[in-house]
Amino acid sequence: MKNIVILGATGSIGQSTLSVIEHNPDQYQVFALVGGKNVELMATQCSQFKPKFAALVDEKAAKLLAEQLKALNLTTQVLTGEQAICELAAHPDANIVMAAIVGAAGLLPTLAAVKAGKQILLANKESLVTCGQIFIDEARKSGATLLPVDSEHNAIFQSLPLVAQQKIGFCPLAELGVSRIILTGSGGPFREKSLAEFDSITPEQAIAHPNWSMGKKISVDSATMMNKGLEYIEARWLFNASVEEMEIIIHPQSIIHSMVRYIDGSVIAQMGNPDMRTPIAHTMAYPNRIPSGVMPLDFGKLTELTFIEPDFKRYPNLKLAIEASAEGQYATTALNAANEIAVDAFLNRQIRFTEIERINSTVVENIAPLRVNDVADVLHIDQLAREIAKQAMLNV
């Protein structure tokens, strides 16, 4: 029986993780659940899975949760605050940590798990986007196992040789005969929408992804293809890939989740129905396999698999992310922070859909090149970028 800590338990990935655990109750014990401020859902999860600890970032929400759990006669200990969450991520009794807190908020708890040498199921892409080298170095030092949960990175991981899987962050792709890593993306809900209509896109339209069930922020990122841009940055860190070793292709059906091209002409792809429980189950059981609850792919019902080159006029955020990756860690950190501010503003109807890219671009253009040596540097750049983004919003 393995103890699992779920950072971001009330989010989409967290709920999918609990679903996988339901299918494998004899193998996994929920040790701790961590959320933001969703008291009702956290109380329901605690009632069902009975973790030893539960933590909410919001202090008032944590107090309400403690009252509800006491009324339910549950012995789960309720904690709050960043320090407590970091301690849960690094707890000696935890075997596996699902790192699924969205955004920069997940950075420090995930890093705490890395430093503690845990098996980390990495769903928080911002950890590598903002702290790539720091995370890879710390994982190598502590012996932590980094297993990518994002469907694309998980697909690449599965398509690479075993020796590459065992050297996440420093695998020599060329020596292993790998010529290209191919990231696939659906193109989001506006793949065929007229560019003239982009100014009038609403939050409701942007979060209605055609293939995947995701949270609001990541759904908007998928619509702008910033999500694919962040995945591009993350893939470069995870697989030690140069710009020349990366490729992006739009695949509307989301059946092939990504591919690896080899120098002998082979292309190995990982396929499956678009359901996050598949990569979650893979990382939970690695190197073994467990049931995920996902319906098997029915090839008899597949009518077509199509591929399209990305159009940077339609997806300027994707181009921006690729360029930031070439600039370095300061630029990707700034871009990530700007995008969090811009997407939140769009969801709250403060800016138009097209202004997300304008704000992101303004921040990247105005942030000074700064050296990133540690997490303090990252947090400094993150804060600077957020301030520039908020100022830029006043001018849109």
Curated annotation (Swiss-Prot):
The protein's UniProt keywords, in alphabetical order, are: Isoprene biosynthesis, Manganese, Metal-binding, NADP, Oxidoreductase
Glycosyltransferase listed as a keyword: no
Binding site residues for NADPH = 10-13, 36-38, 124, 126, 215
Molecular function as annotated in GO: 1-deoxy-D-xylulose-5-phosphate reductoisomerase activity; manganese ion binding; NADPH binding
Q: In which pathway does it act?
A: Isoprenoid biosynthesis; isopentenyl diphosphate biosynthesis via DXP pathway; isopentenyl diphosphate from 1-deoxy-D-xylulose 5-phosphate: step 1/6
Q: What is its EC number?
A: 1.1.1.267
Q: What does this protein do?
A: Catalyzes the NADPH-dependent rearrangement and reduction of 1-deoxy-D-xylulose-5-phosphate (DXP) to 2-C-methyl-D-erythritol 4-phosphate (MEP).
Family indicated by similarity = Belongs to the DXR family.
The protein in question is named 1-deoxy-D-xylulose 5-phosphate reductoisomerase
Which species is this UniProt entry from?
A: Haemophilus ducreyi (strain 35000HP / ATCC 700724)
Question: What gene, per UniProt, encodes this protein?
Answer: dxr
